[in-house]
């Protein structure tokens, strides 16, 4: 589904522009430096014992998944699939999971008809897989007066399962809105009445803060391993497999980071661009949110290079460049020619040159596979975002506060997710993504608009005050307050409402029939999840020396103990 919005930039004018004093953003230095270089210093060592055990355990799990679904096995199968997905190893069993869930659509089980836990789990798993199952299955859990039954309060596991299911809701599903309100209240009561050190209370607290639908797979897998191993009913084969798999992937990610660190150090950002955020490892972490699987290694490396350069360009526009300098850089990117380099100020030249180099390298590599056309889509997306950055610079230098609608037309581009969604496709395998998929993602489908909306409004909510302190174009908060005569609290309420609706759009767009395969549709979803995690209460990317550092350490430094 295509958005009816037009994203052509408004025609700003340059009037009475005075040369500004360069702002001083005062971003903290890189947290990680060249920490990950050490993973390149040792030759790659294969743990043959772990590798062999990994394959044996995988085959055992596969056999458990392919058994015939019967009344007696439905609950067991659904719980196994849920655990496999939450432990981050579903990519090994996608065909088997698809087969089980497809069969489940045809299979009617009476066993779970009055079990809120199983009904909710079945609903969530099917919707996660793109099946448009009806939410009417929850009607049976209501009283005659239209309220959820009091008996549900005694089933904490059932409440938790229903709560997770509500996050798959789309527009006009009132029963799921009611269920969300009901479960949040009841689960908060559980927390109040329980000791926070109990496993169940901890699960509830975690779920209320980060529902499954909106979490990042690798972060949630790391968390769920510790939860699952204390579950008395856990599958020992699955637990062992997930730990080995987590550590094997971690080693791959460490080697990728080592290779990319060599590239990054050559840019010498700390000296050549000291005004910018040096967030190389954090950008890699962003890439892991989009895809962590080994088959996307090349795509991930390309993605990480582009997002790092985009972050530097963003800071050049927001935190350092003068109006005339930014105009020159914008023109250079639009012309996309190495001859433009000499027209740029000295400090901009390394950045512009590396942008061309990275894109040229991608094109050369993809040319061998006959898919170099992909880079042209990536190039146009980069030109689009740089143009949006410049439009915002013009607003700032003119002291212009756009209407909220004007702001969104530019800000949904400058947030970066249109570019990143396109880039996320570029390095994928030849058969994984085709030209029609690039036409789809670059034509502003609703799921992408929704992801951009979540990005922009979440960022504006947590970061606008700091941006205004250091000199920045008016954020969505200021634009909405000025032109709607609203208070900051009213803006937050409005933004939260829009973000909630955007999640419903995302859920709707992930249901069959799909315009492109689900493994492509979900990339904007995963980008939205990143914002939900790292911009929930503050800007973890800019202030990456606290919670972001802890997350990176748990996923990319510390292995899971066996």
From Swiss-Prot:
Top enzyme class: lyase
SUPFAM superfamilies assigned: Terpenoid cyclases/Protein prenyltransferases, Terpenoid synthases
Cofactor(s) the protein requires to work: Mg(2+)
Pfam family, one: Terpene_synth_C
InterPro entries: Isoprenoid_synthase_dom_sf, Terpene_cyclase-like_1_C, Terpene_cyclase_plant_C1, Terpene_synth_N, Terpene_synth_N_sf, Terpene_synthase-like, Terpene_synthase_metal-bd, Terpenoid_cyclase/PrenylTrfase
Enzyme Commission code(s) on record: 4.2.3.139
Positions contributing to Mg(2+) 3 binding: 467
Residues the record lists as binding Mg(2+) 2: 314, 318
Protein name, per record: Valerena-4,7(11)-diene synthase
Organism name: Valeriana officinalis
Gene name of this polypeptide: TPS2
